[in-house]
Amino acid sequence: MASRSAAIFLLLLAACGLESKPDGGVNGSGGLDASLDAGGIPASADHGRDILTTALQLDLATHHGTANITVASATGTGASFEVGDLDVTSVTNPLGPLDYRVAGGWLDVGVGSAPSQLTVTYGFKNHSNFDGWLNATSLTFLWPRFCGNLFPCHSAPADGVQLSLAVTGVPANKVAVYPANIPADAPAYMLAVAVGDYTYLKVGTTDAGTEVGVYYLPNGLAAAQTGTHNLDRAFDWYERTYGAYTFGNRVASVAAAWGPSGFGGMEHHPLWHVGTASMSDQVTHYHEAAHGWFGDGVRIACWEDFVLSEGTVSYLAARALQAVEGRDVWPSYQADLNAAITDGDTIALPSTCNAIDLIHDPLWSNVPYMKGAFFLRAVEQQVGAPALDRALAKFYREHVGQAASMQQLLDTIHAETGFDPTVLANGWLRSLGHP
């Protein structure tokens, strides 16, 4: 997510939270006793059971969804999914109905301990607080923990799932922009849908064969061309410098009608969203593109590792702009850093793991973006850009499709360059102010 969006969405989300079902829950399996359902297994909770794949069908006209889910094996016989304010109507497998219950925003199912497939049918609601399907603007907004308001999911950033999507119920005069398939493990919030009067413009193709483009709205061509200038070359630079892109061979920036104050973007690879107010801003487009490597390609282990995602891609965007445009963005980054510290300084790398609610925590600010970028720049000044790039590339190769922590990146930098970044990390990431 581009840093300029943080302040806007913080205000919009400050008062919202996951809507829960009544504590008593709702029992399913079509009214059958657990002993009579397809597996004869009573519903039970297992919040940690891994979701391997989710194939979604969303009808935007009826607000009906179907999720075909594959879960990994487990020692127990239950599986649990975040369902927010979804109205779950059935849970089945190929043999028939499964026993389920919905309580506290979670769906618990009895599925057995082996790898299992199940199908959940449900209704989803309109939302207006950037926390689900935004009917007024025909957009989804699921970051950071609102995927359960659109489909059964796990919202923890470390959890990865292979996603596919089919969308129906789109007005005849509109275009729905979404990825039909995301072939590599991705955080659940990465999935997105945008419906509008979109026109596609091809920007170019990288040496690896990745087509880079932009979807813009009426009267948005000039801004789209300005913001995505040389975006194909930047994407090519990311591929050559850090490694192969894993979310397909066609990517694009998508204009998102978040309103006149909705700045920044959101890392919905391979079709990331950029607010219409930021469509002319190259930094935002380059930043969101870089999330294909850090934040999405390599997921963060904890929300407290936010700097691994946002600080790293802020640094990468600056490097890419210098490489393909000869543009120095560090003076503007310095202004952003100064403003972030003045407005509300905080520790960029907390010592806890998933102990915070990010959208209600001071960490959700420009601080991790800018302190993270300047930290990596300080490392670059010690070891040189080529050596740091080799370390970042190795880290990406070793962790792509998985979750990792900022400490693991620090360890990789030390191992690959021989330079121990601890002192710099303590000054930039674990302290108030800056060195």
Where on the chain are the PLM-derived regions?
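Ser/Thr-rich, Pro/Gly/Ala-heavy low-complexity intrinsically disordered linkers and tails
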Residues: 1, 12-46
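Juxtacatalytic substrate-recognition/specificity segment
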Residues: 67, 102, 165, 200-305
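Zn2+-dependent metallopeptidase catalytic core
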Residues: 67-69, 121, 153-158, 162-175, ...
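Surface-exposed beta-strand/loop patches in extracellular or lumenal glycoproteins
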Residues: 68-87, 151-170, 407, 411
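A surface-exposed beta-strand-loop module
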Residues: 83-136
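Post-HExxH zinc-binding segment in Zn-dependent metallohydrolases
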Residues: 238, 265-273, 277, 305-346, ...
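Amphipathic alpha-helical substructures
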Residues: 246, 330, 358, 365-435
